Swiss-Prot record:
It holds the Pfam family SSF. GO terms for molecular function: monocarboxylate:sodium symporter activity; organic acid:sodium symporter activity. This is Sodium-coupled monocarboxylate transporter 1. The gene is slc5a8. CDD domains: SLC5sbd_SMCT1. Residues 591-622 are annotated as: Disordered. In the gastrula and neurula stages, expressed in the gastrula anterior endoderm and in the entire circumference of the blastopore lip superficial endoderm. At tailbud stages, abundant expression observed in the ventral midgut region. As development proceeds expression becomes restricted to the liver diverticulum and ultimately to the presumptive gallbladder, by tadpole stage 35. Also present in pronephros and the tip of the tail. Signal peptide: none annotated. Residues 595-609 have a biased composition (Polar residues). Its main location: membrane. Keywords: Cell membrane, Glycoprotein, Ion transport, Membrane, Sodium, Sodium transport, Symport, Transmembrane, Transmembrane helix, Transport.
Length: 622
């Protein structure tokens, strides 16, 4: 039996494996900095050219948000609370369908670089500016968390200075992102997904061998109440149930995959709309695989430590250190494998941070610089894009300090996306799904949704949820083999009561602490989205939104569903078409366009003009 507290340490082979991962990542960045003549324009840097295909983009989509937060946080979540997290597989499926069928058609059709360009096309510049600012705040905070996560792992298993690791993480990914642009980010993500799967696989296989097969792991998990998949309790105060994960998780992750710049920027870079959609659906397989690996790792961790919990015994100082502790514990006799797992966690972060930096650079250049400084040449814009990437890399390193104060990494990360991503999802939904929503409704809806989600999110951080809604499952110390411990435990079985509220603070808790502030963190996004949509719709109806004529190119239409177009197009009769505006793409193809070819308007030099139905543009009737 594995005995906690007596783990090995990093060897030369582990450091070599880890260094090799960093070296390959950096080399990819250097290669794409100079391949094909380098990053000559901001489009080359931010959009990766014009010929990305589905599979590498799909793997990049998977890697971008399956970060070290997933590698470290999800197994610890399963270890403490059970395998309910596997229900996210349903959420991911719904999210991919919504993203590919609702949001992708509109963004791809318009050929935009920044998703927030859409907000100006559909509403006005002020709405675009609001959306951009919220995205920057959200992404910088989240990136700080995912930089801190692998540094924590390195600190635990190698003794490497925590903040030295934070700086190293930020510097490495900022380097290859700044050098190679989106192409470097995508292809480095492909490599790093492989490292993530390999790291998880090494831990799972060794755990199965140690425990004598998968059967004992599942048996221990069953009797330890970790196989709690089907909790249909509708109580929104319970941290994880089927409904909080499927409903709340769907809203949270749609805010990421449907409208988040880091993800949209990738599938917009695909050379055809079919390739873009395929990238999302292939990415779904990757999400399932990483989720399954993380959950199985958590169950294996419980089976191994069910009689001696390393956290309760204070062998680790935080739940997010449990997974690297397990890796070094069971892989200590196999030089190089502990280094592979740390590379796994590190790869998740490098992919996420580089994606975030590239997205931050894109929205800053497209939304905050280009609209106001139009005289800059493409070469200067390319250098500005690289400089912006470097700046955001430094900012995100600084923001990692906040992550050390936010508690559990997984919940902190998803909470940020919920509080900010929910209202933004509501804003884009207003524009794409509701033709009568006007700029006033969009602004008030966004601000209302953000205020509500921020209220509940900050309240939940100040006032911990009640123990009944978030109490981890019991863990034992009865199998520990130690003679002394720096604690005052007197029982051999000790549940981890980390969320209990000191008695001295109970009287100071407001009434909302056990209701509104105790909502599951997964509902933060749901609340923000629903409030933004409802308020936006009501304000628009009251302010004359029904009188406006919105360009159909900015809306989701039946033509965006090919099967609906086939079914209903024969039913249309001549003379019944409405008088609507359409966009006319005046493509000015360059020689490079003709050489490579693409049906994605994002990569053509074009002018957009508005023409009414029946008028002619370039000899073509609209």
């Amino acid at each position: 039996m594995v005995t906690p507290g007596n783990i090995g340490s990093f060897t030369v082979w582990d450091y070599l494996v880890f260094a090799l991962m960093l070296l390959i990542s950096a080399v990819i960045g250097i290669y794409y900095a100079f391949a094909g003549g380098g990053q000559k324009t901001s489009k080359d840097f931010l959009m990766g050219g014009r010929s990305m295909t589905a599979v590498p983009v799909a793997l990049s989509l998977t890697a971008s948000f399956m970060s070290a937060v997933t590698v470290l946080g999800t197994p610890a979540e399963v270890y403490r609370f059970g395998a309910m997290f596997i229900i996210f597989a349903f959420s991911y499926t719904i999210v991919v369908i919504i993203s590919s069928e609702v949001f992708l058609p509109v963004f791809y059709r318009l050929g935009i670089t920044s998703t927030y360009e859409y907000l100006e096309l559909r509403f006005n510049k002020f709405v675009r500016l609001l959306g951009t600012i919220l995205f920057i705040i959200q992404t910088v905070l989240y990136t700080g968390i995912v930089i801190y996560a692998p540094a924590l792992a390195l600190n635990q298993v190698t003794g490497f200075d925590l903040w030295g690791a934070v700086v190293a993480t930020g510097v490495v990914c900022t380097f290859y992102c700044t050098m190679g642009g989106l192409k470097a980010v995508v292809w480095t993500d492909v490599f790093q997904v492989g490292i993530m799967v390999a790291g998880f696989t090494s831990v799972i296989i060794r755990a199965v061998v140690v425990q004598g097969g998968i059967g004992p792991i599942l048996n221990d998990s069953y009797y330890g109440d970790r196989l709690n998949f089907w909790d249909f309790d509708p109580n929104p105060l319970k941290r994880h149930t089927f409904w909080t994960i499927v409903v709340g998780g769907t809203f949270t992750w749609t805010g990421i995959y449907g409208v988040n710049q880091a993800q949209v920027q990738r599938y917009i870079a695909c050379k055809t709309r079919f390739q873009a959609k395929m990238s999302l659906y292939v990415n779904l397989i990757g999400l399932w695989a990483i989720l399954a690996c993380a959950v199985l790792s958590g169950l294996a961790m419980y089976s191994i430590y069910k009689d001696c919990d390393p956290w309760t015994a204070k062998f680790v100082s935080a739940p997010d250190q449990l997974m690297p502790y397990l890796a070094l514990d069971i892989l200590r006799d196999y030089p190089g494998l502990p280094g592979l797992f740390v590379s796994c966690a590190y790869s998740g972060t490098l992919s996420t941070v580089s994606s975030s930096i590239n997205a931050l650079a894109a929205v800053t250049v497209e939304d905050l610089i280009k609209p106001y400084i139009r005289s800059l040449s493409e070469k200067k814009m390319s250098w500005i894009s690289k400089g912006t990437s470097l700046l955001y890399g430094a900012i995100c390193i600084g923001m990692a300090g906040i992550a050390s104060l936010m508690g559990g990494l997984l919940q902190a990360a998803l909470s940020i996306f919920g509080m900010v991503g929910g209202p933004l999802l509501g804003l884009f939904s207003l524009g794409i799904l509701f033709p009568f929503v006007n700029s006033l409704g969009a602004v008030i809806g966004l601000l209302s949704g953000f205020a509500i989600s921020l209220w509940v999110g900050i309240g939940s951080q100040i006032y911990a949820p009640s123990p009944s809604s978030s109490l981890p499952k019991p863990l034992s110390l009865e199998g520990c083999n130690f003679t002394s411990i720096e604690s005052n435990w007197t029982s051999t079985v000790m549940p981890m009561m980390t969320t209990l509220i000191p008695e001295t603070q109970v009287s100071s808790r407001p009434e909302l602490a056990d209701s509104w502030y105790s909502l599951s963190y997964l509902y933060f996004s749901t609340i923000g989205t629903i409030v933004a949509v409802l308020v936006g719709v009501i304000v628009s109806l009251l302010s004359g939104g029904l009188k406006q004529n919105v360009n159909r190119e900015f809306l989701l239409t039946s033509e965006d569903f090919s099967y609906l177009n086939v079914l209903f197009s024969p039913c249309k009769e001549k003379g019944q078409e409405e008088k609507v505006e359409v966009l006319n793409w005046k493509a000015r193809r360059t020689d490079n366009d003709m050489e490579q070819g693409t049906d994605n308007p994002a990569f053509n030099n074009m002018e957009m003009t508005s023409t009414e139905k029946g008028e002619k543009t370039n000899g073509i009737t609209a």
